[in-house]
Curated annotation (Swiss-Prot):
Keywords: Chromosome, Nucleus, Telomere. This is Telomere length regulation protein TEN1. It comes from the Eukaryota. GO terms for biological process: negative regulation of telomere maintenance; regulation of telomere maintenance via telomerase; regulation of transcription by RNA polymerase II; telomere capping; telomere maintenance via telomerase. GO terms for cellular component: chromosome, telomeric region; CST complex. Interacts with CDC13 and STN1.
Length: 160
């Protein structure tokens, strides 16, 4: 099951903390073996900012075609409203959505991402597994739900 995360800053902090602990960044003796970390899945509802197409050979070798830049939704009263994040996307996934006229800057997306770690203490990679373009009604219903007592309960269970 994916964890629903509403604030990109919290997601970055959660992943960074997990990465630092597993790699013994704080006070490690440097003699620890490299660990292959389990991947994690998250669901985020965000606003599309732009696409950046990959140019480096390393990104292409890893199977990435572009990065989707996303930003927190303002309706969720996030203290980090301007927080942005770059998510890698495969060419297959980009091609499946590129002709959709609703995929424009500012559009709200329901995105499932996988976070995976390389070996040799490389930083985590955020990759889009799938995404859906949300309608205005979907966004309104989502914002009302997460602000409700039932939504708060759901978020607590999802993130425990």
């Amino acid at each position: 099951m994916s964890q629903l995360v509403l604030d990109l800053k919290c997601l970055k902090d959660k992943i960074a903390t997990n990465y630092d602990i597993h790699n013994n960044v704080y006070g490690g003796n440097g003699m620890e073996p490299n660990i292959i970390h389990p991947s994690k899945r998250f669901r985020i509802v965000v606003r599309l900012v732009d696409f950046l197409f990959c140019k480096s050979d390393e990104e292409f070798i890893k199977g990435f075609f572009c990065q989707m830049i996303v930003r927190n939704l303002h309706c969720l009263n996030s203290t980090n409203g301007a927080e942005e994040m770059r998510l890698y996307m495969s060419e297959r996934l980009f091609s499946a959505h590129k002709d959709d006229l609703r995929l424009i800057n500012g559009q709200v997306l329901d995105v499932r991402i996988g976070v995976w770690y390389g070996i040799h203490q490389s930083p985590p990679i955020f990759e889009i597994i799938d995404f859906k373009i949300l309608s205005r009604n979907d966004v309104r219903d989502f914002c009302e739900f997460v602000k409700s007592p039932l939504g708060e309960k759901f978020l607590n269970i999802s993130n425990s």
